């Protein structure tokens, strides 16, 4: 009898909550709205998509990407924007640093004509614009570049040298409290780019920290630490960077994995380079000395030549990528135009 009374009381409470706050304000975990598959947007890096465990950056969540200067933070964000646009998504870029290069973005595959861009005057304006775009439900990806450039209005209007302790941290904390619920409800991916600072007087442990206080660390579902690990040379010329990304926080899959890939100057993340590395690792591409082979046919001597061969034969590159994704159990949406190409008759001709 007590159990029946509890059930009736719970049913009455649920009905009252839905009446007061609207349908869907409380539900069981078995309801479709909660258990539907997580939607993701590719980072543009196959290796990083696999390291994230779900095939990309999760929609309806906050993501933080941080690292030293010139480590590839903006490149990674623009690649994610390009991937979202390929699937028909609408993207916005809040350029608080006033440093976005549209020519470079276009080289990475971003449709700059359709990209929404804002260059706000203050941190409050930037975050208010972000909140309004999220609440519109019409934008799929929003990039905020960067947290360090979100200067509070009081600091801009004050004198140079004035002390404004904790202003930016309070601004971020207040904004994220408002944003998080709307982001989840509208299934928007919001990416914050952040910079690194050094703590003063740290004797033990890591002296590095990110700007904007601790709020973003808590609210972010995914945090990526991106670093440049070396240069890529073609002869004496440096043509790109070796890059490593560590997944330091991940609420949608196991964290602490890392991804290594190449960023080529003027091109962005080298998809072909990743396919070669992962293809060899999973046994789809054979490597003998300097030669690489696929299905028993030689496709290139040295990584540079093999990369160029895969660029010239995108259908075969797509096929190898699909095999890699199937091998690790991670799939992702593919643009309708992809995969329809026929193999060239002379694709394997040496």
Curated annotation (Swiss-Prot):
Coiled coil: none annotated. Its main location: cytoplasm. GO terms for cellular component: cytosol. Keywords: ATP-binding, Cytoplasm, DNA damage, DNA recombination, DNA repair, DNA-binding, Nucleotide-binding, SOS response. One of its GO terms (biological process) is DNA repair. Transmembrane segments: none annotated. It is found in: Cytoplasm. It comes from the Bacteria. This is Protein RecA.
């Amino acid at each position: 009898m007590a159990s029946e009374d509890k059930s009736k009381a719970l049913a009455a409470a649920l009905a009252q909550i839905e009446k007061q706050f609207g349908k869907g304000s409380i539900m069981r975990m078995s309801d479709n709205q909660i258990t539907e598959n997580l939607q993701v947007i590719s980072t543009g890096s196959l290796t990083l998509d696999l390291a994230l465990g779900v095939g990309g950056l999760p929609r309806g969540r906050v993501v933080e990407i941080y690292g030293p200067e010139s480590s590839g933070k903006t490149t990674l964000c623009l690649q994610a924007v390009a991937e979202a646009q390929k699937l028909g998504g609408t993207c916005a870029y809040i350029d608080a640093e006033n440093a976005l290069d549209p020519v470079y973005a276009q080289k990475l595959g971003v449709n700059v004509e359709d990209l929404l861009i804002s260059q706000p005057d203050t941190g409050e304006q930037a975050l208010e614009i972000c909140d309004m775009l999220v609440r519109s439900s019409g934008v799929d990806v929003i990039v905020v570049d960067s947290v360090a450039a979100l200067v509070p209005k009081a600091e801009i209007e004050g004198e140079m040298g004035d002390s404004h302790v904790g202003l930016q941290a309070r601004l971020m904390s207040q904004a994220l409290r408002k944003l998080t619920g709307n982001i989840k409800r509208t299934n928007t991916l919001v990416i914050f780019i952040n910079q690194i600072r050094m703590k003063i007087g740290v004797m033990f442990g890591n002296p590095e920290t990110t700007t904007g206080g601790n709020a973003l660390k808590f609210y972010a579902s995914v945090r990526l630490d991106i670093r440049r690990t070396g240069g890529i040379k073609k002869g004496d010329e440096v043509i790109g960077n070796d890059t490593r990304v560590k997944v330091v926080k991940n609420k949608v899959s196991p964290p602490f994995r890392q991804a290594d890939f190449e960023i080529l100057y003027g091109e962005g993340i080298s998809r072909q380079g990743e396919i070669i590395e992962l293809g060899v690792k999973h046994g789809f591409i054979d490597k003998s000395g300097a030669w690489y082979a696929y299905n028993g046919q030689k496709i290139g001597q040295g990584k540079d030549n093999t990369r160029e061969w895969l660029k010239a034969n995108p259908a075969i590159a797509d096929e190898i990528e699909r095999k890699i994704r199937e091998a690790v159990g991670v799939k992702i949406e593919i643009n309708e135009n992809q995969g329809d190409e026929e193999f060239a008759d002379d694709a394997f001709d040496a």
